[in-house]
Amino acid sequence: MADLLLAERSDAPAPAPGRNGPGSVLSGLPWVLVIAALLLVWSRGSVPAPDLARFSAYWVFALVFPGTLVHRALRGSRGNLPEDLGYGAATGLLLEIIAWALAAATGQQSLLRWWPLPVLVAFAAVPRLRRHWRVEERRPLPVAWHWGMGAALLVVLAWGYTQWRMVPLPPVYGGYYQDVLYHLGLVQELTRAMPFELPHVAGEALRYHYLSDAHIASGSMITGISPAVVLLRLWLVPVVGTAALLAAGLARDLSGSVWAGPVAALAAFIGAGVTLGSPVGASGEMPLSYASPSQTYVLVPLLLLAGLIIDVVRGRSLGRAWPLVPVLGLICAGAKSSALPPLIAGLGLTAVVFWWRKRQVPRPALVALACLGAAMALGFRLFAGGGAGTLRVQALALLHFIAPYSETLGTGDGIWPSAPLPPGINDGGLVGWLLAFAVVAWWVLAQAPRWVGMSLLADGGQRADPAVWLLAGTVLAGAATTWVFQHPSISQIYFWMGVIPVGVVLTTWSLARARAPWPALVVPAVAGALAGIATAGTVVGFAVPRISRPGTPTTSTIEGWLRVLGLSATRYVLFVAVAAALAVGVAARW
């Protein structure tokens, strides 16, 4: 029955729908709905209609079209239009940064809006490039894939709307979150020529990973739209949508299952840990942040780069696409300094494992490792500053920002402790270590959906695939650095946030490997969503009682928090057991 709704494997032969037939209409309808919804939501966000038209044209003609042509020339067509356009948009964002850098270095920002023209002309005039205007070797995806991706993108759009609906466009009375104003100042500065200065301090050189702000500045200069409108409204959803398409393509490539794409796209960016009413949240629940454009923007080049590195470790030739590796590495380093180190660690682990197993130097992997290492070093010299300059080693420092520790043992630690461990742990003795262990265990448990993919390392067949080690090593490195480093503003959490999509792709791959019927996978997801709604107390008569805090921030005790953490973990384990039983029951009947 599942086969009637969705093809199981992406490489299975599928009848190509007629370009004007019912299949084509049904496949295109969800994309029309997504675009219409996006325009509607933008308009409800007080964006004028002329700005909507200009920004839409900018994305189509200055990013998607030239990027798709270049990506097809370097990597080939993916056999279907949506994925081609998604990968093309990601490549277009890369090309835009290069064009912006050239314009800023030469003071020719007025010519920036024309950068796509030479690309489009070249692909129209050169005979052997003209074939990249169309999808080659068509491998159409099932109608259900299109509707699944449409649903995922609509959820992304809804998330974007919830982020900006309470943030009015200027001029207004009131204040903005300080990070938003900081990025707005950077966007204004990046419309000027190099060398850049810190917009808040005259004469101070700008040291920051600012390439996300360069994208927003480019969009403003090319369209003529106010930087505030682009930053506060327009840039976010298209970039997240592009990242969602990349995650979907990566999941489909790795698993060979068509359904893995929409599942990964939705879970990677909108999925959050289900804490089931616990007063202790899971720091770093989502990879997206409205207040941190750098974190959200970097997911696009990071996922595009991850796809290339997967081919490298699997021994596939990149051919003309090899230059993308160092360039994307530098873009990642310049967009968010925490994005590249976990991927480098995962690549290093993969190289060591397969050198040990085969006693052969994996030269392509070492070349890629050298490229990324050089990109990170250059990025540190060109961009690093701000938070990167205040990061230091302190194991378990994340505890400073989690209530059970910060309200008890951590009250006397201060904002910038210099000890190798939070002082409260040692001062608390055995009880201090027990509390630290309980908090870390709860964090790992709450992040469980991002860990499931690690099970592939126990699968003898999959363990031989270098891609498993690459993704698993990347996720582990992101978690480890989050708990090893300390930052006064909890910026170490970005190491984890950056690898969440990687962990979800790995989890989706493992679920596809299990070959469970799709309803068995839907049941736990629906159960998690309902549990989240119920424990939030938003459904009258259905809300599950929330777990109470053990007193106020000044009166809570270690023993009280240990009871709360134990109850939270018990509730979570029971929930997983019930959801698993339901999934097994559905699978048995399907």
What are these regions (language model features)?
Residues 1-143, 566-578, 582:
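Membrane-embedded, hydrophobic transmembrane alpha-helices
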Residues 22-32, 74-92, 143-149, 257-264, ...:
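Membrane-interfacial loop-to-transmembrane alpha-helix junctions, especially the N-terminal start
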Residues 28-46, 144-173, 240-244, 269-272, ...:
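Transmembrane signal-anchor helices characteristic of membrane glycosylation enzymes that use polyprenol
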Residues 65-82, 101-105, 131-133, 237-238, ...:
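Transmembrane alpha-helical segments of multipass membrane enzymes and assembly factors
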Residues 153-296, 300-301:
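Active-site lumenal/periplasmic loops and adjacent helix-entry segments of GT-C-fold
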Residues 293, 325, 349, 354, ...:
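Transmembrane helical bundles and short interhelical boundary loops of multi-pass, membrane-embedded
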Residues 321-337:
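Membrane-interface alpha helices of multi-pass inner-membrane proteins
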